[in-house]
Amino acid sequence: MIEVTLLGTGSPIPDPNRAGPSTLVRAGGQVFLVDCGRGVLQRAAAVGVGAAGLSTLLLTHLHSDHVGDLGDVLITRWVSTFTPDPVPLPIIGPPGTAELVAATLNALRHDIGYRIAHHADLNAPPAVDVREHTDGPVWDRDGVSIRVAPTDHRPVAPTIGFRVDYQGASVVLAGDTVPCAGLDELAAGAGALVHTVIRKDIVATIPQQRLQDICDYHSSVEQAAATAARAGVGTLVMTHYVPALVAGQEEQWRALAAREFAGRVELGDDLHRVQVDAPS
């Protein structure tokens, strides 16, 4: 069984009810944080997960709304890990990830220096193990395997999706993308597909061109559902709603997805959980 928790279902626009894009995946006793938008650690704390308990951080792409709390994750893990010789935090993302992590740590160098000067048991900066990938296997530990494939969020490039497999259960996390062959291949036969969705029918009516531009490189509800149908997944989990999902409108979103996908559709607020089982 794999458990998926939508930690943050919001967008770049601050929302009092939704944290920034982030998803927690638990499998085989391991805890994977996929993206780290604003407020991610508060949401993780609500389900009993702290930064020190993360097995790895997986980044789909380097847009600010998906990495906005990277510094908080790095520093909080560092100061809340009390074992000697802590294991470096594995961080897996597309090319550019190493530069982002290094720049983030550099920006926090004063804070890091203050803490090292103050605490005798903090004698080195936060330890990280950054690996950049665009395709293929990236993780294989205690029965949990993860592989990535390229997605299409151009002009943001490269971008990747993740597939987590454990004891016959499988979950794919698409990140931000339009329909593409890489995601179709990655999601083929998966138990669940976690996919960003936008309501293009609503966004297209906004007068500001900058906001209309987001239609160019995100999937609509119908497009995400069509991807799920092509791939033959069991469940479509919608997240990163643009505009924000309003209470009472859930059935509108479900109806749009149902035009293309006959399977189970999950959507909801932050902390919504979905259990993905192996086929019986």
UniProtKB/Swiss-Prot annotation:
Write the record's keywords in alphabetical order, separated by commas.
Endonuclease, Hydrolase, Metal-binding, Nuclease, tRNA processing, Zinc
Q: What is its EC number?
A: 3.1.26.11
Details of cofactor binding: Binds 2 Zn(2+) ions.
Cofactor(s) needed for function: Zn(2+)
Q: Which Gene3D superfamilies match?
A: Ribonuclease Z/Hydroxyacylglutathione hydrolase-like
- What are the binding positions for Zn(2+) 1 in this chain? 61, 63, 153, 176
What is the catalytic activity of this protein?
Endonucleolytic cleavage of RNA, removing extra 3' nucleotides from tRNA precursor, generating 3' termini of tRNAs. A 3'-hydroxy group is left at the tRNA terminus and a 5'-phosphoryl group is left at the trailer molecule
So where's the catalytic machinery, residue-wise? 65
Highest taxon of the source?
A: Bacteria
Binding positions for Zn(2+) 2 per the UniProt entry? 65-66, 176, 240
CDD domains tied to this protein: arylsulfatase_AtsA-like_MBL-fold
Q: Name one Pfam family in it.
A: Lactamase_B_2
Q: Which InterPro entries match?
A: AtsA-like_MBL-fold, Metallo-B-lactamas, RibonucZ/Hydroxyglut_hydro, RNase_Z/BN
- Would the keyword tRNA processing turn up in this protein's UniProt record? yes
Q: Which GO terms describe its molecular function?
A: 3'-tRNA processing endoribonuclease activity; metal ion binding
Q: What does this protein do?
A: Zinc phosphodiesterase, which displays some tRNA 3'-processing endonuclease activity. Probably involved in tRNA maturation, by removing a 3'-trailer from precursor tRNA.
Family affiliation: Belongs to the RNase Z family.
- Subunit details: Homodimer.
- According to UniProt, the name of this protein is Ribonuclease Z
The record's gene field reads: rnz
